């Protein structure tokens, strides 16, 4: 490859400048020419080539450059497709996981469809137990209160009778009723009868009945009929309403389970044929009965 070399005359004026311009050495001029030639031409070309050959070579170089550009674009496209495939794979994995979770949830709900019925039964039992315990608490409190009142009243009557018997004994001795005269005979008989009565002969049953009657009388006199009726309606009405509500809920839930099973499970004919899913339950039952009758015949 022959390079073009230009002879630059060296001035005799001096090494500094010619007409106030800096003087460059010869090798710097050659270097700048090579640089400009490399910038203009993608490849160094032979000077001995004809203009047609030069144009042909330039066109081939341009074609090569054009062909090299799509490679980068294809790489970009391939990278984009890889990214898209990765995203699609990740999205498919997420969808599969969600589907598996939904299938698991649906299986669990299908297996445990009777959980609301069981829970409602336990809630009804707890509510009834709470109401019954409150009612029994007040009832036992009233009963124990009546027993304490009866016991205290019996003890009080025993003490009174003992004191009365002691008074009768003192009077009997004071008037000398051991040898009574006809004037004091009746009085001595009464004092003797009073003295003979002891505290063990107190009628506990009569006293208990008397105390119970007094308590009921006081209870009714202090509490109005409206309050009593309201309390009874509150207790028994809450029991009846709660039991009716829980029973109605269980009945409707069991009916919904029956309808769901009839619609979800396809009706199967004994001849291993399945009915279409768009038929109603009545038509399915009729067809099943007809098929079973045909097989029996």
Curated annotation (Swiss-Prot):
Instruction: List membrane-spanning regions.
Output: 126-146, 203-223, 228-248
Domain of life of the source: Eukaryota
Q: Which residues in this protein are found as Phosphoserine?
A: 90
Q: What UniProt keywords are attached to this protein's entry?
A: Endoplasmic reticulum, Membrane, mRNA transport, Nucleus, Phosphoprotein, Protein transport, Transmembrane, Transmembrane helix, Transport
Q: Where is the composition biased (Basic residues)?
A: 57-69
Recorded hits in SMART domains, A to Z, give:
Brr6_like_C_C
Its predominant location is endoplasmic reticulum
Q: Name one GO biological process term.
A: nuclear envelope organization
Q: Which InterPro entries match?
A: Brl1/Brr6, Brl1/Brr6_dom
- Report residue spans for region: Disordered: 1-91
- Protein location: Endoplasmic reticulum membrane; Nucleus membrane
Low complexity compositional bias: what residue ranges?
70-79
GO CC annotation: what is one? nuclear membrane
Q: How does it sit in the membrane?
A: Multi-pass membrane protein
Name the family: Belongs to the BRL1/BRR6 family.
Entry-linked PANTHER family = NUCLEUS EXPORT PROTEIN BRL1 (PTHR28136:SF1), NUCLEUS EXPORT PROTEIN BRR6 (PTHR28136)
- Function, please? Involved in mRNA and protein export from nucleus.
Output this protein's name. Answer: Nucleus export protein brr6
Per the UniProt record, the source organism is Schizosaccharomyces pombe (strain 972 / ATCC 24843)
Q: Which gene encodes it?
A: brr6
């Amino acid at each position: 490859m022959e390079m073009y070399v230009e002879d630059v005359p060296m001035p005799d004026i001096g090494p500094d400048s010619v007409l106030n311009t800096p003087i460059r050495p010869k090798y710097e001029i050659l270097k700048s020419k090579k640089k400009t030639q490399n910038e203009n031409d993608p490849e160094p070309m032979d000077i001995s080539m004809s203009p047609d050959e030069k144009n042909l070579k330039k066109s081939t170089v341009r074609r090569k450059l054009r062909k090299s550009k799509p490679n980068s674009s294809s790489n970009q496209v391939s990278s984009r497709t890889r990214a898209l495939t990765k995203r699609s794979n990740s999205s498919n994995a997420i969808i599969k996981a969600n589907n598996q979770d939904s299938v698991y949830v649906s299986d669990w709900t299908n297996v445990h469809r009777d959980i609301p019925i069981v829970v409602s039964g336990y809630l009804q039992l707890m509510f009834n137990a709470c109401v019954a315990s409150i009612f029994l608490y007040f009832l036992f409190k009233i009963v124990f209160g009546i027993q304490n009142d009866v016991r205290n009243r019996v003890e009080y009557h025993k003490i009174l009778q003992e004191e009365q018997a002691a008074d009768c004994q003192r009077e009997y001795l004071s008037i000398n009723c051991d040898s009574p005269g006809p004037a004091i005979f009746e009085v001595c008989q009464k004092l003797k009868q009073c003295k003979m009565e002891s505290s063990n002969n107190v009628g506990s049953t009569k006293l208990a009945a008397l105390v119970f009657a007094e308590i009921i009388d006081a209870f009714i006199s202090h509490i109005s009929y409206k309050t009593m009726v309201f309390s009874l309606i509150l207790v028994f009405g809450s029991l009846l309403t709660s039991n009716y509500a829980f029973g109605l809920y269980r009945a409707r839930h069991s009916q919904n389970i029956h309808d769901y099973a009839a619609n979800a499970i396809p009706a199967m004919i004994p001849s291993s044929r399945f009915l279409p899913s768009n038929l109603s339950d009545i038509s399915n039952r009729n067809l099943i009965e007809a098929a079973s009758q045909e097989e029996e015949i």
